[in-house]
Design a protein with these regions (language model features):
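Internal gly/pro-rich beta-alpha loop/helix module
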Residues: 1-111
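Short acidic, glycine/serine/threonine-rich loops at helix termini
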Residues: 1, 28-33, 56-63, 132-134, ...
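Short, solvent-exposed amphipathic alpha-helical segments in soluble enzyme
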Residues: 3-7, 34-37, 134-140, 190-191, ...
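C-terminal and late-domain segments of enzyme folds
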Residues: 114, 127-137, 144, 243, ...
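Hydrophobic, well-ordered secondary-structure elements that form the walls
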Residues: 173, 209, 234, 275, ...
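Cysteine-nucleophile active-site neighborhood
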Residues: 179-262
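Phosphate-binding active sites in nucleotide-utilizing proteins
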Residues: 111, 115-201
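NTP-binding/hydrolysis catalytic cores, primarily Walker-type P-loop NTPases
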Residues: 68-118, 315-353
Length: 353
């Protein structure tokens, strides 16, 4: 029924075959395979057995850790498992028979090519939750993306030097999600935090999601050995984050922008998702949030007119933070507004030099 439903839902989609997963026994496989072959014309290309242990070590939300010293051994083991339980030649033949996807249009102007904007992004074992598509959207518009690490022994200056850049050449900063709680002690002691704070005070556009928001809050509270330890963060926003054992926000979010900011137009309605075991605490009673969530948890929930509403999003100068993750192709105003804010920042820096 599932295979028929997928095939018939959209006749324009070509379903070349299915691979069975989590198969408990040879009898289990035979029953499912015979049912598919009897009632559909879709070939079964393989059957992956149920495994005793998860082959990919994971933390919260089924995401693996970025730091995994055994990743090659793990990948080799998975490759062997797939090779032994699927018809690789039929899979390759089916894939090779598919039409080529059209190349996405490039929107790079001559001006952008001659002098690209440099947008840095934090990338290390603490911050690495990024959609590649978000990077692609920025690159399509001519942005040069520059990775920086908070956990590296190298200073930002040394890291930038490898790209023939200095701190003054950076036009924006993107801080994605990750596991900052696992490195809270190292982060709180990092000599690189003042540089981020300096960029923010200079009005640099900074866009932070989830873990990035935690970095920009005052403190991060994380349970260790049955008690909470508190770690000072950058403190851009007068708010703190606290971790719990169960998810505090998980799933899709529907957002309405209720206050002006450089990234999401006032009144715009868009979608994102939440992925966090922490929540915002100790916010000021008069704290103003940028978004009202029709669906989702956000940073806080308030009883208003007999309705329990959720709110998210903070802004300080050009520094933005929220729990909501975006998928840039579905929120087209994000990349364009981020770039326009970065371009204006570069212009102002040159005029004030």
């Amino acid at each position: 029924a599932l295979v028929l439903g997928i095939r018939n839902f959209d006749p324009e989609i070509r379903l070349a075959g299915v691979i069975l997963n989590n198969i408990a026994s040879a009898r289990h496989q035979t029953i499912i395979r015979q049912s598919i072959e009897e009632y559909t014309d879709i070939p079964v290309l393989g059957a992956i057995p149920r495994l005793k242990d998860n082959p990919i070590p994971e933390r919260h939300l089924c995401l693996s850790l970025n730091k995994n010293d055994d990743k090659q051994i793990m990948l080799d083991s998975l490759a062997e498992l797939i090779a032994d339980n699927t018809d690789i030649q039929k899979i390759l033949a089916a894939a090779g028979d598919m039409p080529r996807l059209p190349d996405p249009p490039l929107e790079i102007t001559r001006k952008m090519q001659s002098s690209p904007l440099n947008i840095a992004y934090l990338y290390d074992d603490a911050f690495w939750f990024y959609y590649q598509e978000n990077f692609d959207e920025l690159k399509k518009l001519g942005v040069n993306l520059v990775p920086l690490s908070l956990l590296s022994e190298q200073s930002f200056a040394e890291q930038l030097q490898a790209h023939k850049l200095t701190a003054k050449n950076i036009d924006g900063l993107y801080i994605g999600g990750g596991y900052p709680e696992l490195y809270a002690k190292e982060i709180s002691r990092s000599p690189k935090l003042p540089q981020i704070k300096e960029w923010i005070e200079q009005n640099m556009p900074v866009y932070a999601e989830c873990g990035g928001f935690m970095l920009l809050a005052k403190q991060l509270h994380f349970p260790e050995e049955k008690k909470y330890e508190s770690y000072p963060m950058i403190g851009v926003f007068d708010i703190e984050t606290k971790f719990f054992d169960k998810p505090q926000g998980l799933g899709y979010a529907e957002i309405k922008t209720i206050r002006e900011n450089p990234y999401h137009p006032l009144g715009s309605i868009w979608k994102g998702h939440e992925f966090h075991f922490s929540t915002a605490v100790n916010a000021k009673p008069d704290q103003e949030f940028l978004f009202e969530l029709k669906k989702g948890r956000g940073m806080t929930q308030k009883e208003m007119q007999n309705n329990n509403l959720a709110f998210d999003g903070l802004i300080y100068k050009n520094c933005f933070a929220s729990y909501t993750h975006i998928f840039a192709p579905a929120v087209p105003h994000f990349s364009k507004n981020f770039i326009e804010t970065a371009r204006q920042y570069r212009k102002n820096q040159k005029e004030n030099a």
